Amino acid sequence: MNMTLRHDADAIVRASIQAVLPDEAIRRALAEFRPGPGRTLLVAAGKAAWQMAKAAVDTLGQVDGGVVVTKYDHVKGSIPGVDCYEAGHPVPDNGSFFATARALELVQGLTADDTVLFLLSGGGSALFEQPFVSGEELQDITRQLLACGADIVEMNTIRKRLSRVKGGRFAQACAPAKVFAVVLSDILGDPLDMIASGPACPDASTCRQALAIAEKYDLKLSGEARRLLTVETPKTLDNVTTRITGSVRELCAAAAVQCRALGYEPMLLTDQLCCEAREAGSFLASVLSTHAGDGRRLAFLAGGETVVHLTGKGLGGRNQELALAAAPGIAGLNAAVFSVGSDGTDGPTDAAGGYVDGDTNAALQAAGLDVFEVLKQNDAYHALKEVDGLLVTGPTGTNVNDVAVALLRT
């Protein structure tokens, strides 16, 4: 392993995530918060929910009640006046259903004088859920969508129609109370109706689109689930004010600043990356190979969210798969490729992402591992662990997509 490049990678990861932590972002957003004369309630959902809620209560002083639902091991302590729950991700579980039921109970019977502060971050589609269909069927549909390679917009178009809270229905449940929503964006282009499936946003997707997605991926649906795909979601909401705070653009900008501080010339390739993870990794490797003779220290950055089409039964995540796919293409170069999820988790693993450099391919071969066979089995986690290529941050408390970086040293 090239320790100089690895140390640079670790520094870039730390700096980029630090820049998009929710504490200061929440304080900025709440400068515009004007609650009504009645009760002020807090509901927070997503991977960053606990940190967002903690920052909000610290800023406001107190709330009259609240519910937080986030991933397992993401609650860091108690918050005055707020009940905190942990639940399943990326597949919703009974914890998701229970916590969301508590949130719906909390907002029942509100008046026009009351205000709901709704804090939303990525992961909310699984964590904040109360389905019309059975929990078991929703879990099965979610697994089908994850396995078939559907992108996040396609997944959420389906999930909205099966849910009592998605696609604007949570805001409807809060009415006539006002809803002030603060959103950490984890979807390219910041489409409010798609972030966590838009519980407090009018839905721009249509039944026609949902049915087309079900047909495209040959989803196995019950008669009731298929009927629900034909029921339109709310298209207007007059009780919601929304503020977006934090995005993949800020993540990439912070990474670029740190690259420059380390002596690299940063170049942002895109902040709208959306393709197969292994294709992105191979592309970044080809960029490094093309510029290997330039005599410059370069950093190529790409922000967004790739997808993985599952063909095997291994363990990994999209960032680990992206990095591993780059290893053969940079073999022997004074170069590295790494990719990390800003939330600190990548797939169902304890890693945030993966790192490879010009020495990785040889190290894998020495361990009896073939990159292409590992990718076929979707087992990037174990391969990268073998060569110390996992990036582990622990839960970060934020979630604004992923950043991939390709470094080239002279």
Where do the language-model regions lie?
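An N-terminal, well-structured beta->alpha segment
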Residues: 1-43, 51-52
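Active-site segments that bind and position negatively charged phosphate/pyrophosphate groups
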Residues: 263-339, 347-348
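Accessory alpha-helical/coil subdomains and C-terminal extensions
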Residues: 159, 177-180, 202-283, 287
